[in-house]
């Protein structure tokens, strides 16, 4: 077989595809996020184009997927509490700021997220003292 990759020449087997289908790194690891893309970003964003191991990319991908699932679950709960079906930046803000660990991890400002409803304790004490004076 000139020009083709057959078994007699030492290619990868039958060209008609009788072998197993290729599995991506994400599928092997049981992940939804793309390990190959994360590996490419890791390689491109390091100084001096350093080498990145395949397991490092899988690990980072798994962490990103877990954090995304955690934030989406909390934001979905916030949307459900407000009886709406669409997650908005406000729900993301409430979810992230409501969880202590996520709040310390994500210190970014979320656009159109608003602020948490909170009244300073000192201001509450002044209002209570005024009520007591008017009652007496």
From Swiss-Prot:
| Listed Gly residues bias regions | 1-12
Highest rank taxon of the organism: Eukaryota
Family annotation (InterPro entries): Histone-fold, Histone_H2A, Histone_H2A/H2B/H3, Histone_H2A_C
The UniProt annotation puts the region (Disordered) at 1-29
Main localization is: nucleus
Check the record and name the CDD domains matching this protein: HFD_H2A
According to the UniProt record, one GO cellular component term is: nucleus
Q: Which Gene3D superfamilies match?
A: Histone, subunit A
Annotated SUPFAM superfamilies: Histone-fold (SSF47113)
Task: Recite the UniProt keywords alphabetically.
Answer: Acetylation, Chromosome, DNA-binding, Nucleosome core, Nucleus
Residues modified to N6-acetyllysine:
5, 12
The family annotation for this protein states: Belongs to the histone H2A family.
Query: What PANTHER family does its record include?
Result: HISTONE H2A
Q: What does this protein do?
A: Variant histone H2A which can replace H2A in some nucleosomes. Nucleosomes wrap and compact DNA into chromatin, limiting DNA accessibility to the cellular machineries which require DNA as a template. Histones thereby play a central role in transcription regulation, DNA repair, DNA replication and chromosomal stability. DNA accessibility is regulated via a complex set of post-translational modifications of histones, also called histone code, and nucleosome remodeling.
User: What name does the UniProt record give this protein?
Assistant: Histone H2A.Z
Can you name the source organism?
Monascus purpureus
């Amino acid at each position: 077989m000139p020009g083709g990759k057959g078994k007699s020449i030492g290619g990868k087997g039958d060209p008609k595809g009788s072998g197993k289908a290729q599995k991506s790194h994400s599928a092997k690891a049981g992940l939804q996020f793309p390990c190959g893309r994360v590996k490419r970003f890791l390689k491109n964003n390091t100084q001096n184009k350093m080498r990145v191991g395949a397991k490092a990319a899988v690990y980072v991908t798994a962490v990103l997927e877990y954090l995304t699932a955690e934030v989406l679950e909390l934001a979905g709960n916030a949307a459900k509490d407000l009886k709406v079906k669409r997650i908005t930046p406000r729900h993301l803000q409430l979810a992230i700021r409501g969880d202590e660990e996520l709040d310390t991890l994500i210190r970014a400002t979320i656009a159109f997220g608003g602020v948490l409803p909170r009244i300073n304790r000192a201001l509450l004490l002044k209002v209570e003292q005024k009520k007591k004076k008017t009652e007496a």
